From Swiss-Prot:
<keyword id="KW-0068">Autocatalytic cleavage</keyword>
<dbReference type="InterPro" id="IPR043502">
    <property type="entry name" value="DNA/RNA_pol_sf"/>
</dbReference>
<dbReference type="GO" id="GO:0003677">
    <property type="term" value="F:DNA binding"/>
</dbReference>
<dbReference type="GO" id="GO:0006261">
    <property type="term" value="P:DNA-templated DNA replication"/>
</dbReference>
<dbReference type="GO" id="GO:0003887">
    <property type="term" value="F:DNA-directed DNA polymerase activity"/>
</dbReference>
<keyword id="KW-0255">Endonuclease</keyword>
<dbReference type="InterPro" id="IPR006133">
    <property type="entry name" value="DNA-dir_DNA_pol_B_exonuc"/>
</dbReference>
<dbReference type="GO" id="GO:0006314">
    <property type="term" value="P:intron homing"/>
</dbReference>
<dbReference type="InterPro" id="IPR017964">
    <property type="entry name" value="DNA-dir_DNA_pol_B_CS"/>
</dbReference>
<dbReference type="InterPro" id="IPR036844">
    <property type="entry name" value="Hint_dom_sf"/>
</dbReference>
<dbReference type="Pfam" id="PF14890">
    <property type="entry name" value="Intein_splicing"/>
</dbReference>
<dbReference type="GO" id="GO:0004519">
    <property type="term" value="F:endonuclease activity"/>
</dbReference>
<comment type="function">
    <text>Intein encoded endonucleases are thought to mediate intein mobility by site-specific recombination initiated by endonuclease cleavage at the 'homing site' in gene that lack the intein. Intein splicing has been shown to occur via a branched intermediate that is resolved as the reaction proceeds; formation of the branched intermediate is reversible in response to pH shifts.</text>
</comment>
<dbReference type="InterPro" id="IPR006142">
    <property type="entry name" value="INTEIN"/>
</dbReference>
<keyword id="KW-0651">Protein splicing</keyword>
<keyword id="KW-0238">DNA-binding</keyword>
<dbReference type="Pfam" id="PF18714">
    <property type="entry name" value="PI-TkoII_IV"/>
</dbReference>
Amino acid sequence: MILDADYITEDGKPIIRIFKKENGEFKVEYDRNFRPYIYALLKDDSQIDEVRKITAERHGKIVRIIDAEKVRKKFLGRPIEVWRLYFEHPQDVPAIRDKIREHSAVIDIFEYDIPFAKRYLIDKGLIPMEGDEELKLLAFDIETLYHEGEEFAKGPIIMISYADEEEAKVITWKKIDLPYVEVVSSEREMIKRFLKVIREKDPDVIITYNGDSFDLPYLVKRAEKLGIKLPLGRDGSEPKMQRLGDMTAVEIKGRIHFDLYHVIRRTINLPTYTLEAVYEAIFGKPKEKVYAHEIAEAWETGKGLERVAKYSMEDAKVTYELGREFFPMEAQLSRLVGQPLWDVSRSSTGNLVEWYLLRKAYERNELAPNKPDEREYERRLRESYAGGYVKEPEKGLWEGLVSLDFRSLYPSIIITHNVSPDTLNREGCREYDVAPEVGHKFCKDFPGFIPSLLKRLLDERQEIKRKMKASKDPIEKKMLDYRQRAIKILANSILPEEWVPLIKNGKVKIFRIGDFVDGLMKANQGKVKKTGDTEVLEVAGIHAFSFDRKSKKARVMAVKAVIRHRYSGNVYRIVLNSGRKITITEGHSLFVYRNGDLVEATGEDVKIGDLLAVPRSVNLPEKRERLNIVELLLNLSPEETEDIILTIPVKGRKNFFKGMLRTLRWIFGEEKRVRTASRYLRHLENLGYIRLRKIGYDIIDKEGLEKYRTLYEKLVDVVRYNGNKREYLVEFNAVRDVISLMPEEELKEWRIGTRNGFRMGTFVDIDEDFAKLLGYYVSEGSARKWKNQTGGWSYTVRLYNENDEVLDDMEHLAKKFFGKVKRGKNYVEIPKKMAYIIFESLCGTLAENKRVPEVIFTSSKGVRWAFLEGYFIGDGDVHPSKRVRLSTKSELLVNGLVLLLNSLGVSAIKLGYDSGVYRVYVNEELKFTEYRKKKNVYHSHIVPKDILKETFGKVFQKNISYKKFRELVENGKLDREKAKRIEWLLNGDIVLDRVVEIKREYYDGYVYDLSVDEDENFLAGFGFLYAHNSYYGYYGYAKARWYCKECAESVTAWGREYIEFVRKELEEKFGFKVLYIDTDGLYATIPGAKPEEIKKKALEFVDYINAKLPGLLELEYEGFYVRGFFVTKKKYALIDEEGKIITRGLEIVRRDWSEIAKETQAKVLEAILKHGNVEEAVKIVKEVTEKLSKYEIPPEKLVIYEQITRPLHEYKAIGPHVAVAKRLAARGVKVRPGMVIGYIVLRGDGPISKRAILAEEFDLRKHKYDAEYYIENQVLPAVLRILEAFGYRKEDLRWQKTKQTGLTAWLNIKKK
C-alpha cells in the first residue's frame, strides 16, 4: 500500500521516493530514472531545434531542455502532435517555462504545473491507499499555558496526550496522581518522551485535530526554543511546514499526518467546529470543555490538575475515535482520485475532481487543458446562465406527501446527452443532441471524455445510498449521509458589518452594508425577487463610488440592485499595509495587481503580499450647501421640540395670514374675492403657483397651491401676535405636520428657537467658518443635556482646547452663529438648545459615535478643507514620524475622514488602533500644516519594486517615487513603451496597498452585495478598498481545466425541461397536486386521498415516467410523509411515518439561541406535524411568552452561548458576550479565542451588552431577566419562521395581559 510519494535531490538529479506498507512492514522504494517534462505545441515542427536552444537561470545555474520527443495525443478528443520536452530537475520547469511559452515558434505549452511526485504516480499508474494493509493509527493533542495577548508558542507545553487502539495516556511535568498520567521532570523531557512513544509505536498515521495550525507548529517552535530535534518522520526528518494556499500544512515523512479539521470542514456543515461540537454531532455524546484560562489557573495554582489531565486524555481519545471514523472515507477518496491521502484530505472538492480527471486523461492519452490565467479566470467569473427550476411552494398544512427525486440529475443529463467540451458543436458529426432553450449541440457519435468518466462516480453514489438504506448502524448511516451531502456553496459577498459609502437622495452617507440592505428590503418587501437563498432588490436614486476598469478613473455610478444571500462557509479577513481591512466570502473578488493591470481575485485567491486597489481620490458632488434647521427638528420627537417656536416680524405682514387664506379660498371658489386680493396674487405668482394676466390669472401648479392652502389653514388657526416684540409667533409642534409645505422663500424669513431663549435663522449657509466650527466640535467638543432644578431640561455645547489663540477663534465662530457664549479656562461654551440640536444632529455626541456631517461631503473643497483644519487643530498632531495624525474613538468617523481626504486627492493614509483610539496618519502636505523636516515618500506614492521588476524585466533594489519614475522614463533610463503599461498607476485615481494579513474564519448568516452600473465595483470595508460585484457571474468551478460554460448552461436547461415534464405528467395524468419543486426533486399529494392510495399511485407514476425518460435519467420514490408544510423556497418541515421530523431552513442550532427558544420551536413543530394542530402551536407560544413575562422560566433555559473568536482588543462592535468577557478579563480571568461565554440578559435600561451577565452569576434573589428581550429576540423569531406560513404575525403570538376595567379595577385601587 502506497502511503505517500515525494522526491529528493542527489548530485543535482531528482530521485522519486515511494513510502509503502507491505506485508505489515514499512519500506521506501526509490526511482532514479524518472525525468520531469512538459508538452509544447509548435507552429512548425522544424523549429524544434530553435526551441531546444532556449535557456534560463536558476540559482546561478543554467537551465535547458535536455531532450525532446514528438508524441501523438488527443486534445478535447481531436488528434494533435506535440513535443514532450524533458528537463534535468523539477525546479527547472518553473524557471524556464515562460521563456518557452513566449518563444515565437511556440503556440502554447501544457501540463507544466503538475508537481513532480504527483506526475510520477499518474504516469506509472500507481494508486495510493490501494491494498488491504492494516495501518497503525495514533492520535495526539497538546495542552499549553496561554495568557491573553501572548505570542504564539511563548507559553510552555504542559501536557502531551496520545491515544491508539491499545491505550490513552498523558505525559506531563507536574505531579498528577492518575493511572493514565506519566510524569517527567520538565517540558524538555516530556517532548523527548513523546518522541520515544512515536518511535516505539511507529504509527503509519498520526491523527490531529487542527494539528496543521496549532499542535505541530507549536511543538516545533517549543522544540526549537528548548534546543531539541524533533525527528517524527520515518526518515529521521523533522515535520515540514508547507504553504497550501492561505493555510500552513504540516507533513511528516513516511507517516500520514491526518488533520481531521480540514476533512470535517469539507464534509459536514456545523455551526461551530470545536472538537466538542464535532464529537457530539458525530457520536451524539457530549464532551466536557476545559477553557484555556481554567487550564492556566489549574497549572499555576496546582488545583484542578486532575480535571485538566482527564480533559487532555479525552481530547486524544476523541481525536482517535473521530480519526477511525473518517480515515476510511478519505482512504477511499484517495484511491478514487489517485493522489496521496495527505493531499486529498486538504483539497477542495474542485481540486479533487481535477486530479481525478488528470489521471483519467493520461490513461486515455488526452492532453489536459491548462488552468485559466488571470484574464481568462476573470472572464469566466463574469459569465452567467440560468440555474435549476424552483417552484414557489404551496402554503398551508398538507397531509399525505410523497417525495420524488431524480437520481443524480445533472450527471445523468451529462451522460445521457454526452455533454462534454470535446463533443460540443463537433464538426462532421452524424448525430447530435440539442439542448433546449440555449441550442448548443453535442455529438453522440463517440463517448465524451467527462460523460464516460461520470458513470463510475454515479454508480458509487448510488451504492452509498443503498448502503445507507441497508445500514442499521446509526453512526455509519450518518457518515454516509454526510458524504453524499458534502456540497460546498459559494456566495460572492461581503459581511454585514462592512462599511460602504453611498450617495442617497443627493446626500453622502456611510452605512454598514447589512443594515442598509436589510432596511431597503424590509421597506420594499413586495419588490424583492428571490432565487433560492438569494434575494435581489432593484433600486433607484442610490449611487456608489466606483472606478472605470479601463482608465482607472474614479466615478460615481448608479446602484442597480442590492443583494442578500444566506451563506455558511469560510470568510477571509484581509488586512492591508495601510490598516484598511475587509471581510469577504470565498467567492467575492477584490482587485489585485497582476501583469500590469488590475484583475479580480476571490477571497480564497488573495495572498499575503498581493497589491490591492484602493482609492487615491474619489469624486464627490460639489454645491453650496445650506442647513435647513426645520428639517433637523422634524427628525426629533414632539417631546423634544415642545418649547420650539417660529417667529416673524409683524412689519409688512399685518393681517397677511388671514388675507392669504381668504384669497386661497376665493381661488378655490369658496369665498368672495377680498378687497386686497391683488397683493396676495402677486405673492402667489412670485412663488410659482399662478401666472397673472391683464385680467385674471392662470393656475400653473394646482397641486402645489392646494398644499399651500393646507399650510395656511393651519397657520391661521395657530399663529399668535406677540405685542411686546411686534412679531407673529407659532409653536413648532402646532405646525410640524404642515411646515414642510412652506416654500423656502417664506421659510427663510422666519426665525426659530426656544420660547424664552435664543432664536436664529431657519437656514445656515455651510461656509468655511461654519465648517471649521463643526471640525472643532467633532474633534474635541461635547454636547449634553440634563434635568435642571425646575424639572426642565438644560442644554450646552462645549469646545475644548488648551491654546488661547484657538479658543479665541472658537469664541469668534461660535458668536457668529449662536450669539452670546461663555469662555472658560480651556473651553468655549454655547449654552443654547439650538446649538445642542445642530451639533448632535449633524455630528453625534459621544466620542464613539461622532461622524463627519453629511453636508460637509457635498460642500465645496474649500469648506471640506476648513472642516479638516478645525478637526486637526482640535484632535490632530504632527507625529514624530513627520506625519499628520488624527485621532478618534469612532470607527464611523475614521471612515468619514478617509473619504473626505480621498475627495481632496489625499491618499497617503495609514490607519491604526491602539488603547481604544483609532489613528489616521496622513503623509502628505495639508493646507493647514507646516513641516520643519522633509517627510518620507509614503507607500501609496511609490511604484513597488516588484512591479518595476515585472514591467521592465530587471531587479530594482528599492521602490521608487512617482517623480523619480517619471525622471527615469524622460531620461531614457526606463523603456517608455513598457512604462506605458503602468501609466494608469501614476495618472489614474487608484493606488496600490499590500496585503499583510489574512485570517480565515467560519461564518453562518446573511452576506451582502451591490450591483453597480457598468463598473460592477464599489468601495467597501474599513478605510475603503475596491470590491467587485460578482453576483451575476460566479457559476461552476471557474478555475477548472475542463471548464465549459456552454456545457453548464445546457445541463441546467435540460434539467428544467425534465422536471417540468415530470410535473405536468404527474398532475395531468395521475391527479397529483405538486406542492414544491427545487431543481431535481418535488413534493406532491392527492388532496383527500388515503395514504395507501397516494403511495400506490406514486410508485405507479415512477414506473410510468421512467419508461418515458431517456438514457440514465431516472426518477426515484424517496419517501412518504404523513404531514408537512412549506414556508418559502428551501424552508419546510415534514414528518414521516415513524414520527421523525425533518426540517430544512428552519432549524435554530447555533449556540446563540437559548434553550427556551429551541425548546419552544421543537414543541411548535410537534404540535403542527404530529397533531396537525396549528392553534395548539400558537397556544404553546402564548404560554411560553406568558411564563417569560411572569418570570416563571428557570434561568438555565435562558443562557445564550457565544464564542470569543479573536483577541478582545480586536472587537469593534461590542456584543453581549464580548462585554461579559471584557468584565471577566478585568477581574484577572484569562480570556482567549475559542472560549465560549454563557450569559443571561437582565432587565433594565441601556444596551444589552451592559445588561448581560455571566450565567453562573445569575441570582434569582437579586436579578430579573429581561422578559421582553427573550420574547422579542429569542422565542418569537424562532417560531415566526414557522407560523408565518400560516398567516400569523408577531402580535398574534404574544401573551397579552388583560387590562382590568370597571368596578373591579376601582376596587383594586381602593384596596391599595
